[in-house]
Regions:
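Metal-dependent DNA phosphodiester-chemistry modules and their immediately adjacent helices/loops
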Residues: 82-88
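Gly/Ser/Thr-rich active-site cleft segment
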Residues: 90-180
């Protein structure tokens, strides 16, 4: 799938392209392996852990392109968090430095800049995930919205000490826990 560069320092992917490539790859792998689909009991997903997608729970449509790990559009958000002296809080809870590389400030950017996200939050229809979460949700016919600790730990919203989403950090970023 293609990389999209809408502005200097911005890197995006089209989530629908990711989905189509994933389905095509699964079909090709099954065909080449010559095994019966009924014999498949599990699959593995490897992904760019910091790449961020938000989508509508009811329609499955992304509210914006996937914001890729290399994207630097949230530099100002990160600088603001540092000015608020939150570096130690984030580091102690997540093990990460405040940086646009991670998902948290990308989520905040979408919430602040994509008007549809606000409407969906009010209706409890907005969902967030890294690529694995988005693919799992779609592969399971919209029934499973989850990730694992290795992916969650790269979002800058996951407390590595308690092994769960950190509500204090979410509050500092104005990210509702309902989207997780």
């Amino acid at each position: 799938f293609r990389q999209i560069f809408p502005n200097l320092g911005w890197v995006e992917h089209n989530p629908e392209e990711i989905w189509k490539v994933t389905l095509r790859t699964i079909k090709e792998a099954i065909k080449k392996s010559k095994i019966l689909k009924a014999k498949i009991i599990s699959i593995g997903i490897t992904n760019q852990r910091e790449t961020t997608i938000l989508w509508d729970k009811n329609t499955g449509k992304p509210v914006y392109n996937a914001i890729v790990w290399q994207d630097r559009r949230t530099n100002k958000i990160c600088e603001n968090l540092k000015k608020r002296k939150l570096e130690n809080l984030f580091r102690n809870k997540t093990g990460l430095f405040i940086d646009p590389y991670f998902s948290a400030t990308k989520v905040k950017w979408v919430l602040d800049n994509v008007s549809l996200s606000k409407k969906l939050i009010k209706n409890k229809r907005l969902m967030f995930g890294t690529i694995d979460t988005f693919l799992i949700w779609r592969l399971t016919d919209k029934t499973n919205h989850f990730t694992d600790a290795t992916n969650a730990s790269r979002t800058m919203m996951f407390n590595i000490n308690s092994n769960q989403w950190d509500y204090e950090i979410l509050k500092k970023l104005n990210i509702p826990k309902s989207i997780l």
